[in-house]
């Protein structure tokens, strides 16, 4: 089923011209854009550009997600108001998106009058329809800051494995989920105080209402991605299971956001007004351009609406958001497209290794944004698979594909054409069999882009580029140019080469828009669209002098980029330590600790005797098999050879840092005499050792210990 099958073209639109609203998830307004974020914005932008090139009426909408406790606390830390913070961050985000060619039709903010009005309207419609309930709940409360604490703002000791400094909802070591009240020795991340329990009246969206379940079961059947459909069916359960829980949509003051109508001191939870921000940004655009906003969002609208998101927020976009829209009288999304996460060189992005790369640092290092656009596109497909930015492969692929195969075609032909033929192509050569092959491939390449199979589109394009280069190598224009008698053959070769280059540029335009602009200027042609595949270069229009369109990646640029991002961690933490205190020095102490990647929280661990240490049996283990644990976002299941008659089974909370295939064959260190523990996924017969920073927020990353290659399974560590 195609998108046009789901939503036919609106009455009054030109035949075949679709009306499309597309969004990316809203970046949170308390930090910088990094390359992990850019995966999604580049993916969406390529799709939006593809649809524009078809001539469809499409609007790519975005905004900063500005509300919530983290923004409020970040502003307090910086000594500014939340509004001052989000205004500054908006400018930074807009700069970064512009740098990478992300072509929003409107990039707005959720802290707007439009968003407040729309959020209130949707809430009141849901309330009138019987979907809002009020009930008393008990929460953790910080007595020092006098505020209720979200789960992620409480830390303590895991009640299961007793790992320290775990969040209030789940343990990152053993993968157990729990309530904040289950933590041992809990403390507030904000002030360090011990939380107390307080009750408060909260507002809930009744997702458990049978009407919601019935609607969502029908709506899920239209999702394009099988992984998303399967996940939703897992959340919904079988008919009659009633697995959906009501959703808490309110927060207590102090809170930066919109106050709930008729409920003083209560605010909309950020995840209610954030998706409404899609519509608010579009409404702002409609008012400026004279578009009929209601015709796009009303329940009977026949326009199309697509959301590109990360797979980590699928729950919000496939349960809450469509249900909110359905029962408040609005149209629901045509589809939701989720992508995977980004790793760098096979591991989670790391500040200590310099692979936590910000968008601005990439630009500052002098790297071309279109290199990254191309590399990400080459890795992306229509699934939710994670993608890896391998920096050596990045350099090799850009240099080989974009410079060696693509722009090299123009540089080999343009000089001869200008010098020998006044820059004009040979009219009869534009129907060469090679060019027919390229023209015939353009619709398929465009279809790959629309289906979000960017990797396929680029593989096909580079295969065509290989064919063109093969043609040039066989024709040898540099040899033909030596003899005036070969003028006709030379003219034909240069014409075929340059027309082929035009067609390759058309195929690459959604990915390389700035290069495409340069090509259009060089060839003296109007902006390329898919319909231009059959409009060859005119012999009446001379080309202009060739200008370099792309340079090679210099490995020194990559080295400088990594070094800059390593040093930025030190600089940011030092600045925080110097300027950010909360009266008792807790914030400064924490920041100073983050500035030293090797620092550890020594004072939290009392001394033990050598006899105590001798009780721990540390052994070398070889990972002979590894797999993800179904139903867990954090655990990997390891099969370990520890020199015994049979292997051991161990569950480890390291999924965020490693792909299973990366670990197979590695040696590591395990606690061999840890009592076996029965988990819901099976029996864990030990623990592998891993290292992480004391302040994981300032320096994320998890690293298993790897002994010297001379060590063998079963050897004791002593």
Curated annotation (Swiss-Prot):
Q: Per its Swiss-Prot or TrEMBL entry, what cofactor is needed?
A: Zn(2+)
InterPro entries per the UniProt record, alphabetical: aa-tRNA-synth_I_CS, Anticodon_Met, Met-tRNA-synth_bsu_C, Met-tRNA_ligase_1, Met-tRNA_synth, Methionyl/Leucyl_tRNA_Synth, MetRS_core, MetRS_Zn
Could you tell me which residue ranges the tRNA-binding domain spans? 612-718
Amino acids binding Zn(2+): 158, 161, 171, 174
Short sequence motif 'HIGH' region: positions: 27-37
Keyword list (alphabetical) reads: Aminoacyl-tRNA synthetase, ATP-binding, Cytoplasm, Ligase, Metal-binding, Nucleotide-binding, Protein biosynthesis, RNA-binding, tRNA-binding, Zinc
Q: Which GO terms describe its biological process?
A: methionyl-tRNA aminoacylation
User: Key word Manganese present in the record?
Assistant: no
- Single GO molecular function: methionine-tRNA ligase activity
Q: Name one GO cellular component term.
A: cytosol
Cofactor: record remark: Binds 1 zinc ion per subunit.
Q: Which residues cross the membrane?
A: none
Localization annotation: Cytoplasm
In which family does this protein belong, per the annotation? Answer: Belongs to the class-I aminoacyl-tRNA synthetase family. MetG type 1 subfamily.
Q: What HAMAP family does this protein's entry cite?
A: Met_tRNA_synth_type1
Q: What is this protein called?
A: Methionine--tRNA ligase
Tell me the name of the encoding gene.
metG
């Amino acid at each position: 089923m195609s998108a046009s099958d789901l939503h036919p073209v609106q009455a009054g639109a030109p035949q075949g011209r679709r009306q499309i609203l597309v969004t990316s998830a809203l970046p949170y307004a308390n930090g910088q854009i990094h390359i992990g974020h850019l995966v999604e914005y580049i993916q969406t932008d390529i799709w939006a550009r593809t649809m524009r090139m078809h001539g469809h009426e499409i609007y790519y909408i975005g905004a900063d997600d500005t509300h919530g406790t983290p923004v409020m606390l970040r502003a307090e830390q910086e000594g500014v108001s939340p509004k001052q913070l989000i205004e500054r961050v908006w400018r930074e985000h807009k700069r970064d998106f512009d740098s990478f060619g992300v072509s929003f039709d409107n990039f707005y903010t959720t802290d707007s009058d439009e968003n407040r009005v729309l959020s209130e309207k949707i809430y009141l419609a849901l309330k009138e329809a019987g979907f809002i309930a009020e009930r008393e709940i008990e929460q953790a409360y910080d007595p020092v800051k006098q505020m209720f604490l979200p789960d992620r703002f409480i830390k303590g000791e895991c009640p299961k494995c007793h790992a320290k400094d775990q969040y209030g909802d789940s343990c990152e070591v053993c993968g157990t989920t729990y309530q904040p009240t289950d933590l041992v020795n809990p403390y507030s991340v904000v002030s360090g105080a011990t939380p107390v329990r307080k009750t408060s009246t909260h507002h809930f969206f009744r997702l458990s209402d049978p009407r919601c379940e019935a609607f969502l079961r029908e709506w899920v059947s239209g999702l394009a991605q099988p992984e998303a459909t399967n996940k939703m069916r897992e959340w919904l359960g079988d008919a009659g299971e009633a697995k959906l829980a009501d959703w808490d949509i309110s927060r207590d003051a102090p809170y930066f956001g919109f106050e709930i109508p008729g409920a003083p001191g209560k605010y909309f939870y950020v995840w209610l007004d954030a998706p409404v921000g899609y519509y608010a940004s579009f409404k702002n655009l409609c008012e400026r351009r004279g578009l009929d906003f209601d015709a796009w969002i009303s329940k009977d609208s026949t326009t199309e609406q697509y959301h590109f998101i990360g797979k980590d927020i699928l729950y919000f976009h496939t349960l809450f958001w469509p249900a909110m829209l359905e029962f408040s009288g609005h149209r629901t999304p045509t589809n939701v497209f989720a992508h995977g996460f980004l790793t760098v060189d096979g591991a989670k992005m790391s500040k200590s290794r310099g692979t936590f790369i910000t968008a601005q640092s990439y630009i500052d290092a002098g790297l071309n944004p279109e290199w990254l656009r191309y590399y990400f596109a080459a890795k992306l497909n229509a699934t939710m698979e994670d993608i890896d930015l391998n920096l050596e492969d990045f350099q090799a692929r850009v240099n080989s594909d974009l410079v060696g195969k693509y722009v090299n075609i123009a540089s080999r032909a343009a000089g001869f054409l200008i010098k020998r033929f006044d820059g004009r192509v040979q009219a009869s050569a534009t129907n060469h069999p090679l060019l027919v092959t390229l023209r015939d491939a353009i619709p398929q390449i465009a279809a790959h882009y629309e289906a979000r199979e960017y990797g396929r589109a680029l593989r096909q394009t580079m295969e065509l580029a290989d064919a063109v280069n093969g043609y040039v190598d066989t024709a040898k224009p540099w040899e033909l140019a030596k003899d005036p008698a070969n003028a006709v053959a030379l003219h034909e070769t240069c014409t075929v080469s340059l027309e082929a280059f035009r067609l390759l540029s058309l195929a690459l335009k959604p990915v390389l828009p700035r290069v495409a602009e340069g090509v259009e200027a060089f060839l003296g042609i109007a902006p390329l669209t898919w319909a231009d595949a059959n409009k060859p270069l005119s012999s009446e229009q001379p080309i202009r002098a060739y200008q370099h369109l792309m340079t090679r990646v210099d490995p020194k640029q990559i080295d400088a980029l990594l070094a800059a991002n390593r040093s930025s961690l030190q600089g940011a933490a030092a600045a925080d330590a110097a300027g950010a205190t909360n009266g008792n020095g807790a914030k400064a102490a924490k920041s100073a600790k983050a500035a030293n990647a090797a620092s550890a929280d020594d004072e939290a661990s009392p001394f033990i005797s050598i006899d105590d240490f001798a009780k721990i049996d540390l052994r070398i283990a070889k990972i002979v098999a590894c797999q993800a644990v179904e139903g867990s976002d954090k655990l990997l299941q390891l099969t370990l050879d520890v020199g015994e008659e049979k292997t051991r089974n161990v569950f480890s909370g390291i999924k965020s840092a490693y792909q299973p295939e990366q670990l197979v064959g590695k040696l590591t260190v395990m606690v061999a005499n840890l009592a076996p523990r029965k988990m819901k996924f099976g029996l864990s017969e030990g623990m592998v050792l891993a290292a992480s920073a004391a302040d994981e927020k300032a320096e994320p990353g998890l690293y298993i210990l790897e002994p010297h290659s001379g060590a063998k399974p079963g050897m004791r560590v002593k």
